[in-house]
C-alpha cells in the first residue's frame, strides 16, 4: 500500500494548490527530521517524523479527505507491549506495525491520539525510565545508555537532559 493510500484511505494522489506554505507546526516536524538526517541518527525517528510530516501536509494542504482515526485500542496496547519488551534493541516502525497489525500511518495517528505522544517518544520515555533505574543502581552512564537502546552516550545524554533536565552524570 503506498503512503497516500495509507494516509487518505484512497487510491488517488492529493492535489496541492499552494506551492509555498508558512506553517509553524510543519517546521516543528521538518527541523528535527533534517537534524536526524544530517547527523545520521535513529532510523525509527526519521521514518516517524517523515510520515507525520507527510500526513500533516496531505491533511492540511491536500485535497480534503475523511480524517477518520480509528481507536485501535488493542493494537495500540500491543505496540506498547512490544516497545516495553524490546526497548533495549534497535526497533523499527515496521516491526511495531507488524506486531500490532496496523499500517504505519494508522499506527502513528491512532497511537498519538490514544497516548498523546508518538510511538518514538513513548519508546524514548521507556528507555529514559529504565536508564534512570540503572543510574540509581550505580551503573555508569555509558553502560546505562547502551543497555537501554541508545546508540551512544551523546544521544543518551541529550535525551536524558531533555526528559529529566539533568545530565546523567549529575543524576547519578
Where in the sequence are the language-model features?
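Terminal helix-turn-helix DNA-binding modules in bacterial transcription factors
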Residues: 80-81, 85, 90-95, 102, ...
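A secondary-structure capping/hinge motif
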Residues: 111-118, 159-171
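Glycine- and acidic-residue-biased ligand/ion/polar-headgroup-sensing regions
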Residues: 1
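Amphipathic alpha-helical segments in well-ordered regions
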Residues: 49-61, 86, 126, 130, ...
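Short, basic, alpha-helical segments at the C-terminal edge of helix-turn-helix-like DNA-binding modules
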Residues: 65-67, 123-132, 161, 170-172
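Amphipathic alpha-helical segments enriched in hydrophobic/aromatic residues interleaved with Lys/Arg
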Residues: 6-64, 68, 81
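N-terminal positioning helix adjacent to the helix-turn-helix/winged-helix DNA-binding module
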Residues: 25, 29, 71-79, 115, ...
Amino acid at each position: 500500500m503506498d503512503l497516500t493510500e495509507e494516509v487518505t484511505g484512497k487510491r488517488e494522489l492529493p492535489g496541492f494548490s499552494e506551492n509555498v506554505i508558512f506553517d509553524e507546526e510543519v517546521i516543528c516536524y521538518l527541523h528535527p527530521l533534517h537534524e536526524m538526517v544530517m547527523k545520521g541518527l535513529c532510523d525509527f525517528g526519521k521514518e516517524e517524523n517523515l510520515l507525520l510530516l507527510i500526513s500533516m501536509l496531505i491533511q492540511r494542504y491536500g485535497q480534503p479527505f475523511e480524517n477518520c482515526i480509528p481507536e485501535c485500542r488493542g493494537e495500540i496496547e500491543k505496540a506498547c507491549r512490544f516497545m516495553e519488551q524490546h526497548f533495549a534493541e534497535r526497533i523499527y516502525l515496521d516491526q511495531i506495525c507488524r506486531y500490532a497489525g496496523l499500517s504505519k500511518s494508522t499506527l502513528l495517528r491512532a497511537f498519538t491520539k490514544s497516548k498523546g505522544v508518538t510511538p518514538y517518544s513513548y519508546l524514548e520515555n521507556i528507555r529514559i525510565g529504565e536508564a534512570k533505574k540503572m543510574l540509581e543502581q550505580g551503573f555508569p552512564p555509558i553502560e546505562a545508555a547502551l543497555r537501554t537502546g541508545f546508540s551512544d552516550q551523546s544521544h543518551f545524554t541529550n535525551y536524558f537532559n531533555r526528559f529529566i533536565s539533568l545530565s546523567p552524570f549529575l543524576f547519578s
